[in-house]
Amino acid sequence: MTNVFVKKIILFISTLFLSNLIYAEKLQYFVNESTNQSLRAYTSSYSYQPSSMMDKAIENLPTYSNVKKCATNNVSDAILILKPILSYNAQSTILYGDLNVKIYQTRSKVETNPDNFIKTMKISLWNVVKFDEVTMGYYVNEIYTDLLKKLISDIDNLKINKNHPTNGSYCDLLTTIKE
């Protein structure tokens, strides 16, 4: 009897897992590859490329396992256009992080149609950190990870229409735009 009960529990859990995989949003993300950012504190500075730091933060979060980097041959429910901006206030030792997000979904044959942008949002965080060129990469990754955690809860509340498959050809257009 307990063996049958255990089998039913395993079946129930696997059904939940499979339904979650089937109904989960398939998303792509885009971060402008060409931009570099610098953080400064008095005589020290730290330069980094937001796209590679964002890639690292996304890879470390299991909740983003169904989110792919934007590519022409990918088809998804929507594209997240991420623009992270960090600044450091040396006097108060605060690292400020903003994540500007646009959610794009093909709802018109014209790629640049404003109706294709279904949501725009801004997420902000801050951390008290001591500026150090050696550990600044860790703090940047930490604030990116925290921003992405806040973003996933906002995306879960957003109803993305699965009737508008979005291919990654828009990613090619985004790479040509200088922000």
Predicted feature residues:
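A structural "domain/chain start" motif
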Residues: V4, I9, I13-L16, N20-S65, ...
